[in-house]
Curated annotation (Swiss-Prot):
Prenylation is essential for membrane localization. Its EC number is 3.6.5.2. The keyword Transferase does not apply. Interacts with EXOC2/Sec5 and EXOC8/Exo84. Interacts (via effector domain) with RALBP1. It is a lipid-anchor. InterPro entries: P-loop_NTPase, Small_GTP-bd, Small_GTPase, Small_GTPase_Ras-type. It catalyses: GTP + H2O = GDP + phosphate + H(+). The modification Cysteine methyl ester is found at C203. GO terms for molecular function: ATPase binding; G protein activity; GDP binding; GTP binding; GTPase activity; ubiquitin protein ligase binding. This is Ras-related protein Ral-B.
Amino acid sequence: MAANKGKSQGSLVLHKVIMVGSGGVGKSALTLQFMYDEFVEDYEPTKADSYRKKVVLDGEEVQIDILDTAGQEDYAAIRDNYFRSGEGFLLVFSITEHESFTATAEFREQILRVKAEEDKIPLLVVGNKSDLEERRQVPVEEARGKAEEWGVQYVETSAKTRANVDKVFFDLMREIRAKKMSENKDKNGRKSGKSKKSFKERCCLL
């Protein structure tokens, strides 16, 4: 029975999410809250931590793979490799630290550079620590305006209260799924066009 279960899990669709943002904005806290329903305030940064979880997305069982990358400059050189493997990105900043919001533009540029061959990259801008409203440095209008300029969704979250934590991960998975479906459609369209052409060519040769 266990073998069957393992097999079915192995055949589930896998969506790869990368957490991106400056150090201390709460990327790990958001990830751990989503994974384990726990709020972890102090978390030692590493190069990257990977998590995998089975979830139900719009009635379909899927797996989400979350790579939580460190925001520190020391790790900038290895970030490119992580970005290449990602299918969607949560670009996180803290609403209490304007500098972390400013840094999102640079992180986005890095993602676009690494994924230059792709048309539309699934990405959400996330303003974390919404529970600390009294310490807000980034106005909602400013963050929303930047997200609109980039053509992406802006959501405010709190890893502490769990506000919108599920929303950002599930919304991003929906974007990843839509992109995959669109790519498969294009691929199948090209394939059928190719086979029609080769059939035509064969007919001509005969």
